[in-house]
């Protein structure tokens, strides 16, 4: 993977059209594994995750670790959508909490609100929604 870093002026320029800009630092991991790094970073922080990429049941080249999530979006048995903040912040970039009462529409609304810069030399996930969707 090529080394990708943005200058301050590039970050400011990207911020005019995107709400999320990945800040990248490449570190040598030595004997660390994705799980050992996750355990050190997550340390009982709610909403943390370790997502391993895999192709055809075989480990692939990326491990994604998320810590200090913004919040949790759920839909109860009656169909009402609920946002539970982990950071005392709204789910939307404009600061509002007016989410659609349709679960999938609320997910789309949050995703659209937090546009992410796509960088060719980075893994396909630099930020975004991570979770589980179930239905009956």
Identify the residue ranges that each predicted region occupies.
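Signature of the chorismate-utilizing enzyme
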Residues: 1-136
